[in-house]
């Protein structure tokens, strides 16, 4: 049984790692901790532009239509870098709930 990531998943992981390292997510996290902000809006905007928030949204709704495994790949890199962004609440909780229980209009 192969429990390794696929080549595409490894590429996604590497690209996420490069992006977050380039953005210096750890430094941004320190700045957020020293402020009254709960997350970094600039980093979050860049993540949204990359399409990461649409990982689990089906392509028919302009998402990426990827699986939970790709979602975990991104989440792992965000956690590794301690990226101060609302990824969990936005993508795990809200998006998954909307996909599962939302009306067509909401989707």
What are these regions (language model features)?
Residues 8-18:
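A non-catalytic, amphipathic alpha-helix used as a structural packing/dimerization or gating element
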């Amino acid at each position: 049984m192969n429990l390794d990531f696929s080549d595409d998943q490894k590429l996604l992981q590497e690209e996420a790692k490069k992006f977050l390292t380039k953005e210096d997510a750890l430094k941004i996290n320190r700045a957020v901790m020293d402020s009254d902000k709960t997350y970094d809006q600039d980093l979050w905007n860049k993540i949204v532009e990359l399409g990461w928030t649409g990982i689990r949204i089906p392509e028919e709704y302009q998402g990426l239509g990827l699986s939970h495994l790709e979602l975990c790949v991104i989440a792992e890199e965000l956690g590794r870098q301690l990226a101060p962004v609302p990824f969990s609440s936005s993508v795990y909780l809200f998006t998954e709930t909307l996909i599962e229980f939302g009306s067509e209009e909401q989707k």
